[in-house]
Amino acid sequence: MSGISGCPFFLWGLLALLGLALVISLIFNISHYVEKQRQDKMYSYSSDHTRVDEYYIEDTPIYGNLDDMISEPMDENCYEQMKARPEKSVNKMQEATPSAQATNETQMCYASLDHSVKGKRRKPRKQNTHFSDKDGDEQLHAIDASVSKTTLVDSFSPESQAVEENIHDDPIRLFGLIRAKREPIN
């Protein structure tokens, strides 16, 4: 039993040294805290301390500061409400003449909602690289048609664009129009 006496002497010395360093550090921290409290009591002015109802608000608040901001009087007429109903109802839009609906469909600039298989066709490959005069005229006509389509898009009036945007403001109206397009007109 005399051969195994536990930990060697230098480990006990190291442990005692670390314990002493911990106690000294704790004493320094406590004395620093007490000294700081005394200085705060000596130099405390009423204007330096915030009242209970005051708090720090950043110029650019992040997350938590948003709810605590003091509301300023604002003119509510300046802002458009998100849940505002559009002027036209779904019934009025369905009663519109087919020619008006056709013009609205030609002016639609959004992606097609038709996901049927018939709309997904491959582009034909170019077979001939040498064109005759007749083929050249057809190409020029196709280029003119594509240019006229782009000028049509640019020539939309703001009122028609506003009507298209109003459709998306009201989900009930939007789904009504989608159902009306899917159902065949009798």
Swiss-Prot record:
Parts of the chain that traverse the membrane: 8-28
Region (Disordered): 116-140
Annotated segments matching region Interaction with PIK3R1: 79-82
Pfam families, alphabetized: SIT (PF15330)
Localization annotation: Cell membrane
Cellular component terms per the entry's GO annotation: centriolar satellite; mitotic spindle; plasma membrane; T cell receptor complex
Record's signal peptide: none
Chief location of this protein within or outside the cell: membrane
InterPro entries, sorted: T-cell_rcpt-assoc_TM_adapter-1
Residue ranges annotated as Extracellular topological domain: 1-7
Residue numbers bearing the Phosphoserine modification: 46
GO terms (BP aspect): adaptive immune response; cellular defense response; negative regulation of receptor recycling; negative regulation of transport; positive regulation of calcium-mediated signaling; positive regulation of T cell receptor signaling pathway; signal transduction
PTM statement from Swiss-Prot or TrEMBL: Phosphorylated on tyrosines by LCK or FYN upon TCR activation.
Stretches assigned to the Cytoplasmic side: 29-186
Topology with respect to the bilayer: Single-pass type III membrane protein
Superkingdom of the source species: Eukaryota
Compositional bias of kind Basic and acidic residues: 131-140
Keywords: Adaptive immunity, Cell membrane, Disulfide bond, Immunity, Membrane, Phosphoprotein, Signal-anchor, Transmembrane, Transmembrane helix
Matching PANTHER family: T-CELL RECEPTOR-ASSOCIATED TRANSMEMBRANE ADAPTER 1
Function as written in the Swiss-Prot or TrEMBL entry: Stabilizes the TCR (T-cell antigen receptor)/CD3 complex at the surface of T-cells.
Binding partners and assembly: Homodimer; disulfide-linked. Interacts with CD3Z. When phosphorylated, interacts with PIK3R1.
Record-given protein name: T-cell receptor-associated transmembrane adapter 1
Species in which this protein is naturally found: Homo sapiens
